């Protein structure tokens, strides 16, 4: 007997509409891959009468998101409305009744992820959020599956496609303001880009990765961050003359006293994985005790990258229903007393005389064992 799951979508903006169309068009292919069928039951939107993609029937739309998440015929909720207040309550209600959830809401997960993951685990539900971490790059699945039996030493990367796009444009001669305006036109930056350029977005992603890699209930406000707003065209030009590039790097590692984590613009060699990023590309470097150094790269911004990650999570949930596995809910709370803060990561990096306010990235700081890092 074929298993069929009811799916509901919260939000039908640019990304939501793209995901809704993918759910409709890829249904047969996904069923062949997973052995599980699904039916799109409802789409919650603010205005159900607004013009929507032709592939979506009018009957699917409703303005009552709460009735959607509490519908017993819905076994999987895909949340793409963003924000934290309404989204938190909606996801809590869905998870509380054992409904699986896929979300791209990094702002919510970076502050309430540990609580929501614990709730999911207690109810036997899955909470998947690949799109919230690295766009099209399968970082979460790599940590959850391929490296589940290994010990993660560190994670570092260029995790914000908007900032990479801006810095790439500045390398071509644009000012910061001109580069930011271009990123908006290309769809890589929001109308208000402060969440990206001030470093909040990659800090949110580091918090999520700390939950996945280290089982630590870290929230993003505790992570030191410096954005790219103070980077000038002169900084970028000087770096290029030295064979370097400026990139916003997010990095963290475990030490014996706790976590070291930071987001800041640093200098990277042009030939380094971080230096080879361009446009909206993201790259993440994971160092594990047995597997060594692994590098994942791909698109980190835009609707297509987000859709790819969301659909990958949908497939993962459906496969889990066919071959039932325990959801990942191992997060515990790290005791952060005043004397044991989350320390900044980049303090041990060297400086370059020509650009003294920026530090020079060194891979060596990511691969040392925890005991050695204590004395770094």
Residues covered by each model-derived region:
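Rossmann-like NAD(P)H-binding beta-loop-alpha module
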Residues: 121-191, 196-201, 208
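Glycine-rich phosphate/pyrophosphate-binding beta-alpha loops
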Residues: 293-294, 298-304
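General beta-strand structural signal in soluble alpha/beta enzymes
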Residues: 61-63, 70, 78-79, 102-104, ...
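A conserved regulatory-domain signal marking ACT and ACT-like small-molecule sensing domains
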Residues: 309, 314-376
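Rossmann-fold NAD(P)-binding glycine/threonine-rich loop
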Residues: 81, 86-97, 104-145
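Flexible, glycine/charged-enriched surface loops at secondary-structure junctions
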Residues: 37, 196, 217-223, 248, ...
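N-terminal glycine-/serine-/threonine-rich beta1-alpha1-beta2 phosphate-ribose binding loop
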Residues: 1-97
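Substrate-binding/catalytic subdomain of NAD(P)-dependent oxidoreductase enzymes
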Residues: 169-170, 178-283
């Amino acid at each position: 007997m074929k298993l069929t799951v009811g799916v509901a979508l919260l939000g039908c903006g640019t990304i939501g509409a793209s995901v809704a169309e993918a759910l409709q068009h890829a249904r047969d292919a996904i069923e062949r891959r997973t052995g599980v069928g699904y039916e799109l039951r409802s789409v919650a939107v603010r205005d159900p009468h607004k013009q929507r993609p032709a592939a979506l029937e009018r009957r699917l739309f409703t303005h009552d998101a709460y009735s959607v998440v509490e519908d017993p015929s819905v076994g999987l909720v895909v949340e793409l409305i963003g924000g934290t207040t309404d989204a938190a309550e909606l996801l809590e209600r869905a998870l509380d009744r054992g409904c699986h959830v896929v979300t791209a809401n990094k702002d919510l997960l970076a502050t309430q992820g540990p609580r929501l993951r614990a709730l999911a685990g207690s109810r036997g539900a899955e909470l998947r959020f690949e799109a919230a971490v690295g766009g099209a790059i399968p970082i979460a699945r790599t940590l959850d599956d391929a490296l589940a039996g290994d010990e993660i030493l560190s994670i570092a990367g260029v995790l914000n496609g908007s900032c990479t796009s801006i810095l790439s444009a500045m390398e071509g001669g644009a000012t910061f303001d001109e580069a930011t305006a271009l990123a908006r036109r290309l769809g890589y930056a929001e109308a208000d880009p402060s969440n990206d350029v001030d470093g909040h977005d990659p800090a949110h992603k580091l918090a999520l990765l700390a939950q996945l890699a280290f089982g630590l209930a870290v929230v993003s406000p505790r992570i030191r961050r410096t954005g790219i707003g103070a980077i000038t065209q002169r900084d970028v030009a000087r770096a290029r003359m030295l064979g370097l590039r400026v990139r916003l790097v997010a990095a963290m590692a475990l030490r014996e006293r706790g976590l070291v984590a930071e987001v800041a613009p640093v200098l990277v060699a042009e030939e380094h994985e971080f230096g080879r990023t361009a446009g909206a590309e993201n790259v993440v470097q994971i160092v594990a005790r047995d597997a060594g150094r692994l590098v994942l790269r791909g698109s980190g911004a835009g609707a297509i990258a987000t859709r790819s990650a969301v659909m990958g999570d949908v497939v993962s949930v459906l496969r889990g229903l066919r071959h039932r596995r325990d959801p990942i809910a191992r997060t515990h709370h790290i005791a952060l007393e005043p004397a044991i803060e989350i320390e900044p990561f980049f303090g041990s990096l060297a400086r370059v005389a020509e650009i003294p306010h920026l530090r020079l990235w060194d891979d060596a700081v990511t691969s040392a064992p925890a005991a050695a890092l204590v004395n770094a």
